[in-house]
Design a protein with these regions (language model features):
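Long, intrinsically disordered, low-complexity segments
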Residues: 1-6, 42, 57-170
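Enrichment for repetitive, rod-forming helical segments
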Residues: 15, 23, 49, 109, ...
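Flexible, glycine-rich phosphate/dinucleotide-binding loops
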Residues: 26, 50, 125
């Protein structure tokens, strides 16, 4: 049927890299292993220039290189004075370099929303999904209810197990 699980080796590498970076290393493996894993994935894209494939721990732990922003036209399309533009950098995102790598590797694979929810803005409990403006979402005026951070349980799962409780807000 159409419910085939799809999991790439690159996904496993990135999951391990994120864990190592968040924990500061684990079980004898250092944060450098995280950088090596991301580099291994990038080598596929940079075969002709392996130097470009190499990433460092500092780059992964640094801020995002994306210029997060929201652009909205308030009038006639094409007239510059009708645009509301809110742009802000991503240098305050924890593990922003890793978030960038996830975006590049898994573009159009339906990872981004959950990544933006999982990653936080440094020094806050605010996730990037609600804390930054992007595409057609203005962070100052368009707040998504935090219950949307997790998905509802399917009705079939609830019907099949009476001990399950629906996630809050659904």
């Amino acid at each position: 049927y159409d419910d085939v699980p799809f999991f790439r080796l690159a996904d496993a590498y990135f999951i391990k890299a994120e864990c190592l970076l968040r924990l500061g290393g684990y079980n004898g493996e250092s944060e450098q292993v995280a950088a090596d894993l991301v580099t291994a994935v990038r080598q596929r894209a940079f075969k002709s220039d392996p130097g470009k494939a190499t990433v460092t721990v500092a780059q992964l732990k640094g801020g995002s290189r994306y210029n997060y922003g929201h652009r909205e036209n308030q009038g006639i399309m094409g007239e510059a004075d009708n645009w509301i533009i809110t742009e802000e950098g991503g240098d305050d995102i924890e593990l922003g370099g890793l978030l960038d790598e996830l975006a590049w590797e898994f573009v159009a694979e339906h990872h981004r929303r959950q990544d933006l929810i999982r990653f936080r803005i440094n020094g806050t409990n605010q996730n990037v999904y609600n804390g930054k403006s992007w595409f057609c979402k203005d962070a100052k005026t368009d707040k998504t209810d935090r219950h949307c951070d997790i998905f509802p349980l399917p009705k079939s799962a609830l019907d099949g197990n009476i001990k399950l409780k629906q996630n809050p807000g659904y």
